[in-house]
Structures are given as C-alpha cells and as structure tokens.
Amino acid sequence: MRSDWTALQPEVLGAIKAHTGPIHQVVPAPAGNHADVAATVHAAAGRVFVKAARKLSEETDGPEVRSLRNEARIVPHVADFAPRLHWTVEAGGWLVLGFEHVDGRHADYTPGSPDLEILAKTVHALQGARCPDVVRMSVERRWATVAEDVSPMAGGALLHTDVNPENLLITPDGRAALVDWAHASRGAAWVELGLLIPWLLKAGHAPVEVGNWLSQFPSWTAADATHIDLFSEVFAERWRLRAEDSGCPAWVALHADLTRRWAEYRRGSG
C-alpha cells in the first residue's frame, strides 16, 4: 500500500529540499507499486517526479528500496527512453529518487488508437538498443519455478519488461517516455512482446488481433513457435499461482485471466 508524502520525516524532507528548494505543492501519483511514495513535486527549482521507499532497517533494504536502487543504476544508461534521474537522496532510513518530470498522458492501447503506432515505434527502438552492462536481471529466471527449462527465454536483449499503458507517457507533441525501469532485464528480444500481450488483451484486442499486431516485429516472427508456446504456458502458470493467494489484489486475478486466455489461444491455433 502506498504511503502519503507526510510519511517522510523532516530529515528526509530536508534532504529533498536541498535539491528542490522550497516545496509549493505535492501531487500524489495515481498508480504504480514499486515505491512507498510517488508524487509530482512543484518546487522552487521546478517540477520533479519523486519516488521514495523506506528501508527495513538501517542495514537492510526492502523490496521497494531494492527496486529503486536497480532503477537508479539503470536509468542513466537508457536515456533515449527514460526521464532523466536528477538526484538521489538517502536519509532517515529512506531512499529517494528525483526524476525529470514528463508532461505527458498515459498511453491508450485500445483498438484503433493512434497510440499503438507510438507504442510500436518505441518497442522497435527498444529492440534495437544495446543492453547496458548494468542490467543484471535475467528475464528467464522469472519462470524457473514453473518450468524445468527456461533457456528459450534467455538472451542478451534489453527488456523493459513492463510496457503497460501507465508506464508509457506521451507528450503533447507525440514524444514517448518509458518510466519505471525497476525490473529491466536481459533476455530474448521477443519476450518483451510476450509481456505486452495481457495489456493489449485488457485494452480490448482479441487474441488473433494481438498476434497480428505482434507480427510487425522481426524478433517475434523469427522466434521459434515452440518457444512462444512455452512462454505462453509458463507466463499463465506463474500468474495462476499468484492469483491463488486469497489476499491477492483484483489486478493480479485479472492478469491471471488474461494470460490464461492467451495460452488457450496459442494451444488452439497451434
């Protein structure tokens, strides 16, 4: 559950203000789950997007802090896609990142939306980018608990891994910015497209339409169909297991249903 800005102690706020100057307004972010606090801060130095996470103890990082550390390490190396990281603060048991504020809206992935062209252009560019050495996570490890052999998903391509509509910001002049690089990984390039599938289904595309849209990407059409089938099955199984938890949020159950639909489609179209 996300915390309010008021959860930040005076020591932390003072460290932030050393970068921003006096703060005039704080607008909490409506979505996202990789930080305890996320907000647009209006301050003397201008607007900045702030993400903060509380450590478990002075010596121990929690999952949100680890995510932010990972993002802070990666973002400077993906400047063609991500908002700039202006500063980092560690004080009072908190890690705080200050990002360039992007004046943009969340993308619309519904059928017929012009944003789909922007999404495609962004993904094409991402697939052509070199994976920085600082990207340490291997995407195939996500499914190691549900499959004996996950090597078909391995590779050296740069993967954002979460190009959902809320993470693709589109500015008034049509530029795109990819935010939330906490789980960027390296792997087979086509896996990025596989991870997009639930978001396209959720936006109203039929599975066959999703398959047609994905066919514009060389990495997808060149991938071994049996590898895509394997991915579809382990993707659905991992989300099914997550959704079995009685306390899981509604979006997890929905994601499990969407990945199941895609796996069933792949079985039927094989």
Question: What do these predicted ranges mean?
Answer:
Residues 4-5, 17-43:
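ATP-binding glycine-rich phosphate-binding loop
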Residues 8-19, 125-161, 169-177:
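An alpha-helical support segment within catalytic cores of ATP-dependent transferases
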Residues 9, 34, 47-92, 97, ...:
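A conserved alpha-helical element in kinase catalytic cores
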Residues 40-46, 171-172:
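Active-site beta-strand termini and strand-to-loop segments that position acidic
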Residues 89, 102-103:
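Residues forming the ATP-binding cleft of Hanks-type serine/threonine protein kinase domains
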Residues 171-212:
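Active-site Asp-x-Gly
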Residues 195-270:
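Helix-rich C-terminal or lid/interface subdomains of diverse kinases
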